[in-house]
Amino acid sequence: GTTGVAYYPGAGALPDANSSGLAYAAMSGVGMNSAIVRQVRTYLFRSITPCTESGGAKFQSGDGGVNNSASAQVLFGLKALTPAEPANRLAKDPSCGKNKSTNLASYLSSQLTTGTLSNFPYDGNDYGNTAATVVTFNSMKIGKSSVNKSILSLKKNAKAWALKNGQVNAGAVGWLLMAAEATDSSPKKFGGMNLVTTLTKSMKK
């Protein structure tokens, strides 16, 4: 089978690459290797387009084109090691070829020319998936130029993203902490923020 994971349970729910990628990361991260887990892995690989279609991933199989968020989360599910590893020595940005994971990484690298992944095909910037890609590239030991640009962008935009309207976005801080670990950046001096105390002070009993 090629079972994927849907965003919500129930009749009519269709599997998507984002939900499947994060679910696979969680299941494989705790050592699960059942038939269903292997089917989700197959589903993720089938979401990746060939180089002639950019090498990115589609959100759902019937979509007409690739999706940046889906691309980042499929690669995160397939290749990221969690908790995030300390910074590895990274090879150059990858090129599209015969390996699907590398092709997907190549697509993401091509989308990180400014250091920030966009919400393509929608508007806006996606700092969460930028951070996810930093963590994944570090696990894969590739993408040196992309990672360097991305961590600078994350530091520059950390406060605006993680402290929007004066409220702590704990999910954003969590992604920034993982990106900091993956690049040997100080979590206590990250873009003018102490990520550790920002997160702990936001916790409620």
Regions found by a protein language model. Give the residues of each.
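Long, well-ordered core segments of solenoidal/helical folds
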Residues: G1-Y7, A35-K58, D93-L117, S145-G166, ...
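An alpha-helical repeat/solenoid feature that recognizes helix-turn-helix modules
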Residues: G1-R38, E53-A87, S118-S145, L163-F190, ...
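Non-catalytic propeptide/linker segments at domain boundaries
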Residues: E85-R89, D93-S95
